[in-house]
UniProtKB/Swiss-Prot annotation:
<dbReference type="InterPro" id="IPR050485">
    <property type="entry name" value="Proline_metab_enzyme"/>
</dbReference>
<dbReference type="GO" id="GO:0003842">
    <property type="term" value="F:1-pyrroline-5-carboxylate dehydrogenase activity"/>
</dbReference>
<dbReference type="InterPro" id="IPR029510">
    <property type="entry name" value="Ald_DH_CS_GLU"/>
</dbReference>
<dbReference type="InterPro" id="IPR016162">
    <property type="entry name" value="Ald_DH_N"/>
</dbReference>
<dbReference type="InterPro" id="IPR047597">
    <property type="entry name" value="RocA_bacillales"/>
</dbReference>
<dbReference type="InterPro" id="IPR016161">
    <property type="entry name" value="Ald_DH/histidinol_DH"/>
</dbReference>
<dbReference type="GO" id="GO:0010133">
    <property type="term" value="P:proline catabolic process to glutamate"/>
</dbReference>
<comment type="similarity">
    <text>Belongs to the aldehyde dehydrogenase family. RocA subfamily.</text>
</comment>
<feature type="active site">
    <location>
        <position position="320"/>
    </location>
</feature>
<protein>
    <recommendedName>
        <fullName>1-pyrroline-5-carboxylate dehydrogenase</fullName>
        <ecNumber>1.2.1.88</ecNumber>
    </recommendedName>
</protein>
<dbReference type="InterPro" id="IPR005932">
    <property type="entry name" value="RocA"/>
</dbReference>
<dbReference type="GO" id="GO:0006537">
    <property type="term" value="P:glutamate biosynthetic process"/>
</dbReference>
<dbReference type="InterPro" id="IPR016160">
    <property type="entry name" value="Ald_DH_CS_CYS"/>
</dbReference>
<keyword id="KW-0560">Oxidoreductase</keyword>
<feature type="active site">
    <location>
        <position position="286"/>
    </location>
</feature>
<dbReference type="GO" id="GO:0009898">
    <property type="term" value="C:cytoplasmic side of plasma membrane"/>
</dbReference>
<dbReference type="Pfam" id="PF00171">
    <property type="entry name" value="Aldedh"/>
</dbReference>
């Protein structure tokens, strides 16, 4: 009998012992920098000449590690290894597969601060953000293991006299898992193990900006007893091996988290049936958002301001759930904007290794340049009230930036920026607020601050997002508590950490026996 699932507690860094322990882990990780991480194909460690050089976004001179990269020949080798491993892995009992996840969760829990420290160094995450990322990875392992145990018997169906009908789930085959930089442990681990625990084998292509933490997680899965060939680690260029694997006739499904542009490209290419392909490929995609915090006229205004600020600037706005738009009722607009600006100016921006840092850098030069471009656009679309400056002399730092009086159809209100920039718009009334909330091509997260029960119930039906929060910010979904995933161009309507997510990685089979 398994213990009932509960999410992994976050570390309380106000306790001196926790602060000390995390500092010691950071010191240890600093001694591990600059190592080489090979490909892992069928358990074989393969070094290649071409490397991804992972750098610290807070210190461009510091190299976190060197990850070998796969070409198409090695990607094909990984595909063949996964195909061979699938024949035996799919026949393993669900209990056995789940137990490997439980063991991996225990290992990760013991090494929690170590993995969080890698996230500080490689992803530029402040302590609390890094800790939450690692906790979420543990949650995915624990939750999906339990979900597989629930699904192992299939689902009940009716039987008539003289027959026995059964309905059960089978694995799909070989999957391609393409993970993002912004949750390089949690989302990478969650998408990988969801495929694995359901009996599939995978090729894992981690984000170019964060290959080291993915390599460390592969080590954890090996230690937990995962057989060779089930998880094949192949960093590489998206244009070279990404397209190759998405289009491969033996690929059964693609699990992708990232930008709208890349997600649409994958969806289109996966849809084309290749010579020798025996199925229609399944695509599981989460592709970002343009998420809105709504503030009603009777809201708690201090709560509203903090919800706007922390939703916009947590992890430098590099969350698909980030509240990059705020829509405020005209009756309280000036006061909420004033409070949000004042709170923003108290945020500390700096090296994420410092426990007092609230906001670290953006992930890399391309991101820095993109965000700074949008800040320039914002200067012509709204009133700059906070931030607007960047400094890339040592790392990729951008001050938390607020633009007010932005038109609802402006680029700042419509396009995903993925940085510490929030656009604020004034609404005439609640109807107008909802109209603006639904006027983008995305539909991932949203929040409504109000004391009006009728408005809450209306938003529950009419605010068209996959994750809607009332009287809090729009980030911070917890596995098993707030299953995560959105509508429209935010993805394929999958809900990570939810009761039906694993089923996306399986196919149902009906058997009927007459007697």
């Amino acid at each position: 009998m398994t213990v009932t699932y509960a999410h992994e507690p976050f570390t309380d860094f106000t306790e001196a012992k926790n602060k000390t322990a995390f500092g010691e882990s950071l010191a240890f990780v600093n001694t591990q920098l600059g190592k080489h991480y090979p490909l892992v194909i069928n358990g074989e460690k393969i070094e290649t000449d071409r490397k991804i050089i992972s750098i610290n976004p807070a210190n461009k001179e510091e190299i976190i590690g060197y990850a070998s990269t796969a070409d198409q020949e090695l990607a094909e080798k990984a595909m063949q290894a996964a195909l061979q491993a699938f024949d035996s892995w799919k026949k393993q009992r669900p209990e056995h597969r789940a137990n490997i996840l439980f063991k991996a969760a225990a290992i990760l829990r013991r090494r929690k601060h170590e993995f969080s420290s890698y996230l500080v160094k490689e992803a530029g995450k402040p302590w609390k953000e890094a800790d939450a990322d690692t906790a979420e990875a543990i949650d995915f392992l624990e939750f999906y293991a339990r979900q597989m145990l629930k699904l192992k018997e299939g689902a009940p169906v009716k039987s008539r006299a003289g027959e026995v009908n059964q309905y059960h789930y089978e694995a799909l085959g070989v999957g391609i898992v393409i993970s993002p930089f912004n949750f390089p442990l949690a989302i990478m681990a969650g998408t990988a193990v969801a495929a694995i625990v359901t009996g599939n084998t995978i090729l894992l292509k981690p984000a170019d900006a964060a290959p080291v933490v993915a390599a460390k997680f592969v080590e954890v899965m090996e230690e937990a007893g995962l057989p060779n060939g089930v998880l094949n680690y192949i960093p590489g260029d998206g244009a070279e091996i990404g397209d190759f694997l998405v289009e491969h006739p033996k690929t059964r499904f693609v699990s992708f988290t990232g930008s709208r542009a890349v997600g649409c490209r994958i969806y289109e290419r996966a849809a084309k049936v290749q010579p020798g392909q025996k199925w229609l490929k399944r695509v599981i995609a989460e592709m970002g958002g343009k998420d809105t915090v709504l503030v009603d006229k009777d809201a708690d205004l201090d709560l509203a301001a903090s919800s706007i600020v922390y939703s916009a600037f947590g992890y430098s706005g590099q969350k698909c759930s980030a509240g990059s738009r705020a829509v405020i009722h005209q009756d309280v607009y000036d006061e909420v904007v004033e409070k949000a600006v004042a709170l923003t100016k108290t945020l500390t921006v700096g090296n994420p290794e410092d426990p007092d840092t609230y906001m670290g850098p953006v992930i890399h030069e391309a991101s820095y340049n993109k965000v700074m471009k949008y800040i320039e656009i914002g200067k012509s679309e709204g009133k700059l009230l906070a931030g607007g400056e960047g400094d890339d002399s040592k790392g990729y730092f951008i001050q938390p930036t607020i633009f007010a009086d932005v038109d609802e159809n402006a680029r700042l209100m419509q396009e995903e920026i993925f940085g510490p920039v929030v656009a604020i718009c004034k609404a005439r009334d609640f109807d107008h607020m909802l109209e603006i909330a639904n006027n983008t091509e995305y539909g991932l997260t949203g929040a409504l601050l109000t004391k009006n029960r009728a408005h809450i119930e209306r938003a529950r039906e009419d605010f068209h997002v996959g994750n809607l929060y009332f009287n809090r910010g729009c980030t911070g979904a917890i596995v098993g508590y707030q299953p995560f995933g959105g509508f429209n161009m935010s993805g394929t309507d999958s809900k990570a950490g939810g009761p039906d997510y694993l089923i996306l990685h399986m196919q149902a089979k009906t058997t009927s026996e007459a007697f």
